[in-house]
Amino acid sequence: MSSIEQLYSTTQFPSLSSCNTNINNTNNNNNINNINNNTNINTGNLLKNTFFKNNIIYNTNNNSINNNSNNNIINNNNNNLLNSNNQNSFQNQNNLNSIHNHNNNNNNNNSNNNNTSNSENLDSLKSALLSSNIFNGSSSSIAHQNLINLIISSQNNNNNNGNSNSNTPDQKSTMADILLNSSVPDYFEWCSDIINMPKDGNEKSNNSNGGNNNGNNNGNNNNNHNNNNNNNSNNNNNNNSDSVPSPQNNYQSPQSDNQSSMVPSFNFSNQNSANSSNNNNNNNGSSNNNNNVRSEPTTPNDESNNNSNNTNNNNNNNNNNNNNQQQQLSSNQNSSPLIYSVPSYYVPNYGVVLSAPMKGNSSSSILPPQAWPQNNNNNNGNSNSNNGNNNASGFSDFMFNGSNIDYNSIMNNNNNNNNNNNNNNNNNNNNNNNSNNNNNNSNNNNGNNGGMFNGGFVNNNNHNNNNNNNNNNGNLNFHNFLQFQNQLQNSNQQQQQQQLQQQQQLQQHQQQQQQLQQQQLQQQFNIGKPCNINQKKGRGANNNNNNMPIGNQASLVISHPSLKMEGHHHLQQQQQQQHHHQHQQHQQNGNGNNTQIVNSAFLDLSSPDSHNQMSPSSPICLPESPMGAQHWESGLDPSSLQKQNEINPPISVRSNVVFFEPYLAGEPGRHKACWNLLEPMHRNYYQPIQFKLPSFPDTSLPITQIDDKTGIFDSQRFLAFNNPQAMSKYESYRIYIHPSLGYSGNAKRFKQQPDVNEKALILDGNVYDGHLNPIYNCKICTEYYQTKSYFSANPHAKGKVLLVKNNILTRVKDGGFTLSLKPMCCSGHNSHIPLYFHFTLTNPLTNEVVLQSLINVNVKQWKKSVPNKSKKQRFE
């Protein structure tokens, strides 16, 4: 934050309404507290009661001052105040202007005080300077030379019609000797020395004899020394010949917490044009303008253009009214207190938003700092870089000024107040092209005369022909601004593109992780499945033909665990289209021939969301599986059971207990026994089934002889095979249900998948009709469940022919376990032949099918309810 921003953010200004006496607040950090507003201010009292704390002036003098005091250094009879027009003398000043004493044109021959000689004034000043440490530091020699040049230049301007008491050359040399034997001033001691100058009762004012130069020399007042100006020397008592030299600008005053310092600048109430300028003959070209004096026009917005630079080259400087803010004062000159007007808005980063009427393009906004010109002023002599304190006088005048502000004056006042050597990093927009190569005061104003844009809303054509510094930087600044906008837009576009790329990469990474997780899950349920879709189609087309050797099928199953799943996504899309086409043919032909829709057996029923888009009245069209392959019963093809039944038909065993037998990898689908349940099952009803595991999983069932009468195999051998005392290999293993069969009902929180290295078995299976053709769905049952609004909580269960309850913890205990099965279709819908349920058990640790079982059961459509006794009595 710059100094002006810190000042505006921390300084609170009183809000008043009118002002009798102007205060030209041109310091970088303007902060005035309790300035005395008496009409006739005693200079001695003002300085005595003014103390400096952290470069902030505090005036504690609240007493009335005698209008006709003989001891006043300056006796202002007509509301004349001490015009301290050097706001920069306390912090990084360029023009080392000390206290400026301007004269009132109406004070002609109004002083009755006794006059003292210039020599007495010099003696008093000499004694004060010699008794104080005015200079101190390594840069004192430069400071000495600057002050000497200032004194010489100021004393060369005593051209006021013979009415001024100018110093003689001896007096000049005396002042030079005094200054060369001094050091850099300390403000407390320096001010106290000036205040405590020896005073006699005989000190009197040097009155002029009354001239006719009313306003003629108003533009020629020296900012450094007011030497008998305007024939009205009544205001410059004891200071007409040799005004007090100002402190050098290479002294940097201590900074306060608010980093603000200011010397109040007072104006005469009856003065029309008091715009003084430096008349240093050492300036190459136009000298620095007095940016600290306010003119008080008789009409509003009167631009006082009398601020000409009276040097050797006084060209093209007619509009140098920088910081010469016009203000129409109240007619009451003796009673109203000081008025401060605060700007309506303040933008910390970009400057002050002006609320007053502006000339030019008033709709233009202040540009950001990146678009401001970068003018590094190379200063000659004793200039100090005053970074951050650029808006000293312009904005301070604006803050203490009223309405009707000339925008050209304000915009050109920002950096022309004795801060002309500042290396402005942020606010270098409003410097003049009057690059005054003043080797002594280092006022190199290499700025932009046209404000922010040359020819824009500020048109102040102050060119110095002698210096040839017509730096029309407006177009360059506008080009820099456009370049800044383009860079900003390009950076924003690049950031947006990077964000999009990052989002895309993140989405791809998430998709890959999801696919990997689903792949790991799918591998647990794809044991023994062939991965070649063309092979599935070939076997599906030969459902009713047993021409394909079983050995070939076995080789396909054996090689499955080592196959990769690459390319399945593309093949699955083709297979899904064929399945949809074949499903339409199945609807047209009816349910009589189920072998025509073999490819629909590759539907993936493992995903819980696989049936969300399924319509009961339309064929089942399931979404793609994550692995790109359709699920079928683990370890089997849809035609495996039918082929093996024709080659090696199993032995039918009637029992209420179902035994698992070893899975033959070389002959998938081959069973030694088919377990016929003694009790029928009913559609849409749960029925518990008890399963047994062999004690020796690698040994086939000992079913070789069947009793013709009972139809039961040799029980003795079977009892020996199923020894209850022998511990099963899979004892205490947990049984998980494959998602293609599992149904949880209203239960939502239960474990569906085994953990890593967990001892578990996964149950998978499918339903076949009486001819061992797979059943995919039943149109009649589907429409029935739709009318009953079934599976509203579990839409993924719609269309399934068999459901197994999976929300109950099930483990192998004593060589067996029990599951609850619910058939969703009946035998009457499938040629009135009992249905076949086929199950497999897969070990997730080895990812291999280990056991299998085949069940034959009669499923009835309706279950007759038994009426209770009350109903029977009612019917009777």
Swiss-Prot record:
GO cellular component: nucleus
Biased segments, Low complexity type: 205-241, 265-292, 304-336, 375-391, 412-447, 455-478
Coiled coil, from the record: 483-524
Signal sequence interval, chain numbering: none
Composition skew (Polar residues), residue ranges: 242-264, 293-303, 589-599, 607-618
Keyword Zinc found: yes
Chain intervals for the UniProt region annotation (Interaction with the carA promoter element): 654-870
Protein name: CAR1 transcription factor
InterPro entries: Mediator/Homeobox_domain (IPR052145)
Subcellular compartments: Nucleus
Biological function: Nuclear transcription factor with zinc-dependent sequence binding specificity. Required for carA-1 and carA-2 expression in early development. Also required throughout later developmental stages - where it has a cell-autonomous role that is distinct from its capacity to control carA-1 and carA-2 expression. Required for terminal spore differentiation but not essential for cell differentiation and cell sorting. May function to help insulate distinct pathways from simultaneous and universal activation by cAMP.
Inducing or repressing factors: Up-regulated by P.aeruginosa, PAO1 strain and PA14 strain infection.
Any single biological process term in GO: sorocarp development
